[in-house]
Amino acid sequence: MGSLRAILKNPEDLYPLVKLKLAARHAEKQIPPSPNWGFCYSMLHKVSRSFALVIQQLPVELRDAVCIFYLVLRALDTVEDDTSIPTDVKVPILISFHQHVYDREWHFSCGTKEYKVLMDQFHHVSTAFLELRKHYQQAIEDITMRMGAGMAKFICKEVETTDDYDEYCHYVAGLVGLGLSKLFHASEKEDLASDSLSNSMGLFLQKTNIIRDYLEDINEVPKCRMFWPREIWSKYVNKLEELKYEDNSAKAVQCLNDMVTNALPHVEDCLTYMSALRDPSIFRFCAIPQVMAIGTLAMCYDNIEVFRGVVKMRRGLTAKVIDRTRTIADVYGAFFDFSCMLKSKVNNNDPNATKTLKRLEVILKTCRDSGTLNKRKSYIIRSEPNYSPVLIVVIFIILAIILAQLSGNRS
């Protein structure tokens, strides 16, 4: 009923949702039959359905390299995230992880659910890795080595300052941006982007995730994970976990807004990076997550629900982003729309209001100066006509029947 209610409220979401559903089914049908690659792509669908969809934009050879790159780093991240592993065991694994990708026999039991399966059967990933061309292998090994060393450093060190925060985000996400740029260049489809721009692409995504995932991280057992920098949260509370208490709601929202404001300066670099991409498939692969990130920040800003549960874009809006993000004009339009939405939520009494508005105005000016805003459809301002709820219900039922028949024919 929740999905139907959302569609009745936002009927323009229906068509993109159906397209997304069909695309997801098509992607699942594309899983290779070989045991190793079949495991890798099926695992990709389990650990990140959204990434599994986005990766389908890429040409096959590059797609395979990016798939393995993602799974290797996801495995590394699983080791880092498992708070039950003693530090004296975890640190050496993180530091040497780049060597294990060459070992067809290596595996390490940790994580839960699908992540445990990934770690227990890591030999499928390492075997597929060894089938990649050498320059792809070298790029993946280099980034894995640097990321593992950075993660090991922060196992023994808390995120105290905003510089620490940027450094941690560089290790766990900025390096992903550098690695992807290397893979794109190795495929001979793109020029090699600068490290600073590639780093910003990763930092913007990672900071968005850290903001959104506050409650999940702080409630982690047996030990909480704390990525918000003390330099920011200590202005509002004595302990980071105090932000989730109702008595601290006003301070929590102010701290949240401070964190969102900290993420905004990366946007200009991201727009510069994306505007230089030539290959349409690589462009979509890079652009869709960035648009999702600015949309998520707009949802999170000034929203106490970040400290109560999960805040994310509605599925219909996500589907719309995936469907409409095709050109740089679409990207500038999306960043303009979501920045306007965020700007409308800024309370002048917020201690960081002036800084937030200044940073948003820089983004809005960049989007205006692109000269492309008249070429896009708004993500937020509804330009489509409102449809009769009865008509929407009828269409929804018909589409459900069609999808059920398609599913039956495939089985």
UniProtKB/Swiss-Prot annotation:
Alphabetized InterPro entries for the sequence? Isoprenoid_synthase_dom_sf, Squ/phyt_synthse, Squal_synth-like, Squalene/phytoene_synthase_CS, Trans_IPPS_euk-type, Trans_IPPS_HH
Give the source species. Nicotiana benthamiana
What the record says about family reads: Belongs to the phytoene/squalene synthase family.
Chief place where the protein resides: endoplasmic reticulum
Provide the protein name: Squalene synthase
Please list the reactions this protein catalyses: 2 (2E,6E)-farnesyl diphosphate + NADPH + H(+) = squalene + 2 diphosphate + NADP(+); 2 (2E,6E)-farnesyl diphosphate + NADH + H(+) = squalene + 2 diphosphate + NAD(+)
Q: Which CDD domains match?
A: Trans_IPPS_HH
User: What is its pathway?
Assistant: Terpene metabolism; lanosterol biosynthesis; lanosterol from farnesyl diphosphate: step 1/3
Q: Where in the cell is the protein located?
A: Endoplasmic reticulum membrane
* Keywords per UniProt: Endoplasmic reticulum, Isoprene biosynthesis, Magnesium, Membrane, Multifunctional enzyme, NADP, Transferase, Transmembrane, Transmembrane helix
Q: Please list every transmembrane segment annotated in the UniProt record, as residue ranges.
A: 281-301, 388-408
As for membrane topology, the entry says: Multi-pass membrane protein
One GO term under biological process is: isoprenoid biosynthetic process
State a GO cellular component annotated for this protein: endoplasmic reticulum membrane
Superkingdom of origin organism: Eukaryota
Q: Name one GO molecular function term.
A: squalene synthase [NAD(P)H] activity
State the needed cofactors, names only: Mg(2+)
Gene3D superfamilies the UniProt entry points to: Farnesyl Diphosphate Synthase
Q: What is its EC number?
A: 2.5.1.21
Q: Which Pfam families does this one have?
A: SQS_PSY
